């Protein structure tokens, strides 16, 4: 299975959070939104954002806010495709785990 509960899950959560804002969103807000579903430090999250940008799943732009620049992250078409793959993988994964917990899968 491609989907695991480590890096891929965090990538999926970040892409889902960023995809909610059509014009993109900034790092601190992404951190807060991700923390609403999974505990994560900024020192963990920013390398994920940089990697997703390097992988062309996210693009960035800077905009002035309160006298300083704020970096915004926006999902790309490649990022949307990756997010859709993660959604399918998550559905398969969570269905199997639910069946296992309910006793419906023979080991």
Can you say where each PLM-predicted feature lies in the sequence?
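Beta-hairpin "wing" of winged helix-turn-helix
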Residues: 55-69, 74
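Short, hydrophobic-biased segments on the C-terminal half of alpha helices
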Residues: 46-51
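A general structural signal marking secondary-structure boundaries and capping sites
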Residues: 22, 56, 101-104
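N-terminal helix-turn-helix DNA-binding core of bacterial DNA-binding proteins
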Residues: 2-44
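Amphipathic alpha-helical dimerization/coiled-coil segments
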Residues: 84-107
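Accessory beta->alpha helical hairpin/"wing" motif in late/C-terminal subdomains of nucleic-acid enzymes
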Residues: 75-80
């Amino acid at each position: 299975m491609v989907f695991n509960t480590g890096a891929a899950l965090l990538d999926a959560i970040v892409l889902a959070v960023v995809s909610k804002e059509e014009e993109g969103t900034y790092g601190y807000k992404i951190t807060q939104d991700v923390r609403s579903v999974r505990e994560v430090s900024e020192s963990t999250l920013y390398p994920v954002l940089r990697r997703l940008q390097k992988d062309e799943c996210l693009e960035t732009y800077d905009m002035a806010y309160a006298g300083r620049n704020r970096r915004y992250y926006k999902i790309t078409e490649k990022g949307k495709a990756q997010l859709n793959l993660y959604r399918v993988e998550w559905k398969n994964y969570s269905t199997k785990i639910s069946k296992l917990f309910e006793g419906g899968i023979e080991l």
